[in-house]
C-alpha cells in the first residue's frame, strides 16, 4: 500500500535535514496518513479510505459524497 491520500493525492516529499553546522542530509517528509472507515449513505455501505488529515478535513468540510465524486472525477479514486 503506497502512502498516497485517495481524496487529495497528497504524498510524502523529499527534502534536507539541516544541522546547526548547515550540513545537509536527505530525508523524507511523511504525510499525516491513516486508514479510516466511512459509512456512505448514498450506497448504503461502509467504505475504507486511505486518507491524510487534509483529506479528512476536506470530507468534513464538503461531505463524503461530494469528496468522493470530486476525487473520482480527478482520477484519484476508482468507484465500482
Swiss-Prot record:
InterPro entries assigned to the protein according to its UniProt record, in alphabetical order: Ribosomal_bL28, Ribosomal_bL28/bL31-like_sf, Ribosomal_bL28_bact-type, Ribosomal_bL28_sf
UniProt GO molecular function: structural constituent of ribosome
Keywords on record: Ribonucleoprotein, Ribosomal protein
Ranges where the record places region Disordered: 1-21
Any Pfam family hit: Ribosomal_L28
A single cellular component GO annotation: ribonucleoprotein complex
Alphabetical GO biological process terms: translation
HAMAP family assigned: Ribosomal_bL28 (MF_00373)
Family classification: Belongs to the bacterial ribosomal protein bL28 family.
Protein name: Large ribosomal subunit protein bL28
Amino acid at each position: 500500500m503506497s502512502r498516497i491520500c485517495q481524496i487529495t493525492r497528497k504524498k510524502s516529499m523529499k527534502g534536507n535535514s539541516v544541522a546547526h553546522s548547515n550540513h545537509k542530509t536527505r530525508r523524507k517528509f511523511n504525510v499525516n496518513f491513516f486508514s479510516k472507515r466511512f459509512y456512505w449513505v448514498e450506497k448504503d455501505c461502509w467504505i475504507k479510505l486511505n486518507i491524510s488529515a487534509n483529506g479528512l478535513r476536506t470530507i468534513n468540510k464538503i461531505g463524503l459524497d461530494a469528496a468522493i465524486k470530486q476525487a473520482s472525477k480527478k482520477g484519484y479514486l476508482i468507484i465500482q
